[in-house]
C-alpha cells in the first residue's frame, strides 16, 4: 500500500477520534509540532529507523519527548513505530490539517510572487479567493519566486491560477504561432 493511502487512512482515523473527543484543534496543534520536529531533526529519523534499536526504546523516547502532547498523539506515534511507518508522519499531518480546514471552510493557498506580498495584498487575495472557492476564509502562504517576471501564480489544492507575465507571454506566443500556420 502506498504511503499516501496509508497517511490518508491514519489522518481519517485521527480526524474522527478528534471529533468524538472535541479536541481537533489541540490534536492538530500537537501534530503540527510533531511534524516540525520530524522534518527538522534528521537524527531523530535515523534513530527511529535504526534496526538495532529496540522498538520499546524508540516508543519510550517518543513518549518522553512529546510528554506534554495529547495521549492520542503519543499513542499514534507508538503505533507508527511498531508498524515501521514513522516516515509517513508529515503526510499524515498534512492530510489531517486538510480535513480539519475543509470542515471549518478554510482553504490553503500558496501564492508565488516576485516579492513578498504586503498585508493589504494578502487580504485582497483572501477575500476574492474565499468568494471564488466558496470558503469562509483562505490561508495564504507566500513563496517568493525570482523566476516570475511579474504577476503571481496561486495554487489551491490541485488547481493553479497562473497570472504571471511569463505565462501571458507564452499564451501570446502560442497564439501567434498558431495564427501563422
From Swiss-Prot:
Family matches, as InterPro entries: ATP_synth_OSCP/delta_N_sf (IPR026015), ATPase_OSCP/d_CS (IPR020781), ATPase_OSCP/dsu (IPR000711)
Intracellular or extracellular location(s): Cell membrane
Any one GO molecular-function label of the UniProt entry: proton-transporting ATP synthase activity, rotational mechanism
Keywords recorded for this protein, A-Z: ATP synthesis, Cell membrane, CF(1), Hydrogen ion transport, Ion transport, Membrane, Transport
Main location: membrane
Domain of life of the organism encoding this protein: Bacteria
Complexes and interactors: F-type ATPases have 2 components, F(1) - the catalytic core - and F(0) - the membrane proton channel. F(1) has five subunits: alpha(3), beta(3), gamma(1), delta(1), epsilon(1). F(0) has three main subunits: a(1), b(2) and c(10-14). The alpha and beta chains form an alternating ring which encloses part of the gamma chain. F(1) is attached to F(0) by a central stalk formed by the gamma and epsilon chains, while a peripheral stalk is formed by the delta and b chains.
UniProt function note: F(1)F(0) ATP synthase produces ATP from ADP in the presence of a proton or sodium gradient. F-type ATPases consist of two structural domains, F(1) containing the extramembraneous catalytic core and F(0) containing the membrane proton channel, linked together by a central stalk and a peripheral stalk. During catalysis, ATP synthesis in the catalytic domain of F(1) is coupled via a rotary mechanism of the central stalk subunits to proton translocation. This protein is part of the stalk that links CF(0) to CF(1). It either transmits conformational changes from CF(0) to CF(1) or is implicated in proton conduction.
Family affiliation: Belongs to the ATPase delta chain family.
Full protein name: ATP synthase subunit delta
Gene giving rise to this polypeptide: atpH
